[in-house]
Regions:
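Phosphate/diphosphate-binding loops
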Residues: 160, 208-209, 216-217, 221-225, ...
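A short acidic (Asp/Glu
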Residues: 55-56, 183-184, 299-302, 393-395
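Generic beta-strand/beta-sheet core signal
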Residues: 111, 174, 182-183, 194, ...
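Short, glycine/charge-rich flexible loops or terminal/linker lids adjacent to PRPP-binding catalytic cores
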Residues: 308-353, 364, 391-398
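Conserved short alpha-helical segments that host acidic/polar catalytic motifs at enzyme active sites
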Residues: 1-223, 228-286, 292, 380
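PRPP-dependent phosphoribosyltransferase catalytic core
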Residues: 162, 177-178, 214-220, 314, ...
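Secondary-structure transition/capping motifs at alpha-helix termini
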Residues: 131, 151-152, 283-287, 305-312, ...
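Flexible loop/turn segments at secondary-structure boundaries
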Residues: 22-24, 87-88, 118, 188-189, ...
């Protein structure tokens, strides 16, 4: 990768376990629950009495481990796993995690969810001092920082490295005798800790993975925290006290599974509240509510309950196609929208439809769905979005890193309405979003990062700053 501001970057899912004889198999099941967070590649690294073993490849988890022998060989009582979407770096096997590093004095595995905002500067400095990178992923940078630290203890080395990298990150580090887990100072990415019946400790991007393996949730990892897990138990520490919660609001809006809980808030419940608040802000007459499956169904329920309108199944999704936001090229997204949804004419014909969707990024999906509903006979289609207008890029690990690819950054609400062919377009207010999610915290914006909506980033953008400032002067329309 060249570390410029580039489009189509997203997030991943990580899972780890310490202290179970079936660690790799449980990691497989955990990753299966996180498959929605990335479909380009997957991998598992196991720890068998200090011996690290790994299998990784391109494709879905089931494809990567299609041969049972590849999972069976990953013996040991500790494991970390990763499902990947190309946050940074090219889509190749070399960039599939977990990474494994073997130096003359240490070996360890690494899994990372997020994006580093000072990766270019750090990589340049590391290479200048002799570091050799085996991938184009920014995730590899932390390993070189750990290796080159002069701190006398391993934990000291890890803390120093974590204090050097900037951006949004959740790290799982598998060493010979311990698993170390950490979050960035703002906790942009979700990460939770659980416990198995036998005492094994598990870590996951989302709590939905705990249900599958029978683990009990203990607590969420805190911003700036270092969690050390070994045979003696769990130790909680910090590499910085300069922390302030600003978790990605898109986790609640779109990314996370409805059955996951993040910072004490159930995702389905938050989305229902978003839908209810959206109904209070909606100003048009309608007959039925139709949610775009699957991530908008919770918001549609809340909208219908608040408005008193019937919630109908006016759109059917082919469950065997990939999520369009996560596919890595615009051409694939266009094809994906055509393949994934069908309108139910018997439900929408002659009706004024409120079409609930979670967000509008490029407008590709919204325009096609409005067209589908009108072709099926809907007399009016009013688009109601369960999030504010997405007008600013994200640099902490989401699939939007240039303003040029955001329709709301380049068009007014009325222009966007015309482009997507809707009879009206309503976005949820930022205040409505914050209140709907309702994290119990004193942090600004209710503990959420809402920079995608208002352009106020919680941290400096480092290597991305200059390009971002330049992009603010540009206005692009990709619709003619």
């Amino acid at each position: 990768m060249t570390y410029e501001v580039k489009s189509l970057n997203e997030e991943c899912g990580v899972f780890g376990i310490w202290g179970h004889p079936d660690a790799a198999k449980l990691t497989y099941f955990g990753l299966h629950s996180l498959q929605h967070r990335g479909q380009e590649g997957a991998g598992i690294l196991s720890n068998d009495a200090g011996q690290l073993k790994r299998h990784r490849n391109m494709g879905l988890l089931s494809e990567v481990f299609k041969n049972p022998a590849n999972l069976d060989k990953l013996t040991g009582t500790g494991a970390i796993g990763h499902v990947r979407y190309a946050t940074a770096g090219e889509a190749s096997v070399d960039n599939i995690q977990p990474f494994m590093f073997k130096f003359h004095d240490m070996q360890f595995g690494l899994a990372h969810n997020g994006n580093l905002t000072n990766a270019a500067s750090l990589k340049k400095e590391l290479e200048k001092n002799g570091a050799i990178f085996s991938s184009t992923s920014d995730s590899e940078i932390l390993a070189h920082l750990i290796r080159r630290s002069h701190k006398p203890t391993l934990i000291g080395k890890v803390k120093e490295a974590l204090s050097t990298v900037k951006g949004g990150f959740a790290y799982l580090l598998m060493f010979e005798d311990k698993l170390i887990v950490s979050l960035d100072p703002n906790g942009y990415r979700p990460l939770s800790i659980g416990r198995m019946a036998n005492g094994a400790i598990v870590v996951s991007s989302e709590t939905c993975a705990f249900e599958v393996i029978g683990a009990e949730w203990l607590r969420d990892v805190k911003p700036g925290e270092v969690v050390i897990i070994d045979d003696q138990g769990i130790q909680y520490d910090y590499y910085t006290t300069d922390t302030q919660l600003a978790i990605c609001s898109m986790e609640y809006i779109y990314f996370a599974r409805p059955d996951s809980n993040i910072h004490g808030v159930n995702v389905h419940t938050a989305r229902k509240r978003m839908g209810a608040q959206l109904a209070r802000e909606f100003k048009h007459e309608a007959d039925i509510v139709v949610g775009v499956p699957n991530s908008s169904l919770s918001a549609a329920m809340g909208f219908a309950e608040e408005s008193g309108l019937p919630n109908e199944m006016g759109l059917i999704k082919n469950q065997y196609t990939q999520r369009t936001f996560i596919q890595p090229t615009q051409e694939l997204r266009e094809q994906g929208v055509r393949m994934k949804l069908s309108a139910v004419s018997g439900v929408v014909k002659g009706k004024r439809v409120v079409m609930i969707d979670d967000s509008i990024v490029r407008g590709t999906t919204s325009r096609r769905i409005v067209q589908l509903l009108k072709e099926a006979g809907a007399s009016e289609v009013h688009v109601a979005i369960g999030s504010p207008a997405l007008a600013y890029p994200c640099f902490y690990g989401i699939d939007i890193q240039t303003r040029q690819e955001l329709i709301a950054a380049n068009h007014t609400v009325e222009e966007t309405r015309q482009i997507i062919g809707a009879d009206s377009l309503t976005y949820l207010s930022i205040e409505g979003l914050i209140d709907s999610i309702g994290i119990e915290t004193d942090a600004p914006n209710g503990g959420l990062c809402v920079a995608y909506f208002d352009g106020n980033y919680p941290t400096p953008l480092y290597d991305y700053e200059e390009e971002y400032r330049r992009s603010l002067e540009e206005k692009t329309s990709f619709y003619k």
